[in-house]
Amino acid sequence: MYCLGLMSGTSVDSIDAALVKITGENVDLEIELLSGINHYYPEKLRQTILEVADGKPLSMERLAELDEEIALCFVEAVNKIKQKYSTVALIGSHGQTIYHRPPFKEKLGYTLQLGRGEIIANLTGIPTVNNFRAADIAVGGQGAPLVSKIDACLLSHPQHHRCVQNLGGIGNVTYLPPKEEKNWENRIIGWDTGPGNILIDLAVNRLTHGEKTYDNNGEWAAQGNPHSQLVEQWLKQGFFQQTPPKSTGRELFGEAYLEQCWQDAQVYNLSETDFLATLTELTAASIAHSYQQFLKDPIDEILLCGGGSHNLYLKERIQSHFPSTTTVKTTDEVGMNSDFKEAIAFAILAYWRYVSKIPGNLPQVTGAKQARLLGDIHLPLNS
């Protein structure tokens, strides 16, 4: 079955569209990536999304308009794929997160992804699954990370302890025990590790007055020196001490957090390059800190994916926190495209919801009280 996954993350850099051929049943799947593209938001729309995600108030009327505008951009991404592949049978659309609140004590969490699935289905003529996180949250889960079950299916190793570390705007990890070990499936865990690219990207945007949006290959940060005392200070923040299940987003690690980091850096008179190096070090150190706190077994391989996997300086800094017996590489090196891995995941989640009708979440990862079917199904007109 030809399934198209659509994903736009907290960085709001583009809509990732990945067309995959899925064969097999339930969790015994084979995946072939046929096409992957990045479809960019118009800059004005992107800025609006970022402002809303950072807490700018807007009317319900404007929210409804924004929901539709985002859906139409997702439709454009689908149509680009359809120009070459007319046999797309199913769409899994994550949508665009503009708000995420983890559960707290007895209070359920809440999440809001814009980009109406019914519009995508009707305008493309393809059944569409969206709103994947809500069902997990409704039974007490974090609604994230949702990729862990897919990581287990596609990236587990018979003998190696692996961590699949996504480096999108926010970082998240899936720990995969060796498949040959007893009850390995029940020992899979995952959580959000903290900032991935988000603080680095926001800082680059600030320092270049909007001319650049990311640090290409980490070349700018690599010219500086990270300030270890400042990193240690930042790691005392409450989220880094919180035990999994846990999730986060721009609500915590956004513009306001960057401003506080900037003010902290002024105390030490850091240069721009040292500031970027220190933010990069925070991402690397928070990952290492997280593993050391919450994982019992030594890790054989760390598999990086997402936009940050291209940041060579970040990759180097992550490796520096682990012994030489732990290999840091990208998922590309084990056969999984690192740029489109998240989009591929939502194609699979849609397949599980629409075709296999099996749960997509792992309760031990999200904290949900039970496994649930994830996503709302939207059928096109006249179907």
Curated annotation (Swiss-Prot):
Gene Ontology molecular function, alphabetical: ATP binding; kinase activity; phosphotransferase activity, alcohol group as acceptor
Which Gene3D superfamilies does the entry mention?
3.30.420.40
Q: Which SUPFAM superfamilies match?
A: Actin-like ATPase domain
GO BP terms: namely: 1,6-anhydro-N-acetyl-beta-muramic acid catabolic process; amino sugar metabolic process; peptidoglycan turnover
Pathway(s) annotated for this protein in UniProt: Amino-sugar metabolism; 1,6-anhydro-N-acetylmuramate degradation; Cell wall biogenesis; peptidoglycan recycling
In which domain of life is the source organism classified?
Bacteria
Leading EC class: transferase
Pfam families, sorted: AnmK (PF03702)
Where ATP binds, per the record, is at G9, T10, S11, V12, D13, S14, I15, D16
Q: What catalytic activity does the UniProt entry give for this protein?
A: 1,6-anhydro-N-acetyl-beta-muramate + ATP + H2O = N-acetyl-D-muramate 6-phosphate + ADP + H(+)
The UniProt keyword set, sorted, is:
ATP-binding, Carbohydrate metabolism, Kinase, Nucleotide-binding, Transferase
Matches recorded under InterPro entries = Anhydro_N_Ac-Mur_kinase, ATPase_NBD
Q: According to the UniProt entry, what is the EC number of this protein?
A: 2.7.1.170
Q: Does the keyword Acetylation apply?
A: no
Family statement: Belongs to the anhydro-N-acetylmuramic acid kinase family.
What the entry lists under NCBIfam families is as follows: PRK09585.1-3, PRK09585.2-2, PRK09585.3-2
Per the entry, what this protein does is: Catalyzes the specific phosphorylation of 1,6-anhydro-N-acetylmuramic acid (anhMurNAc) with the simultaneous cleavage of the 1,6-anhydro ring, generating MurNAc-6-P. Is required for the utilization of anhMurNAc either imported from the medium or derived from its own cell wall murein, and thus plays a role in cell wall recycling.
Name of the protein described by the UniProt record: Anhydro-N-acetylmuramic acid kinase
- Source organism: Crocosphaera subtropica (strain ATCC 51142 / BH68) (Cyanothece sp. (strain ATCC 51142))
Q: Taxonomic lineage per UniProt? A: Bacteria, Bacillati, Cyanobacteriota, Cyanophyceae, Oscillatoriophycideae
| Gene that encodes the chain | anmK
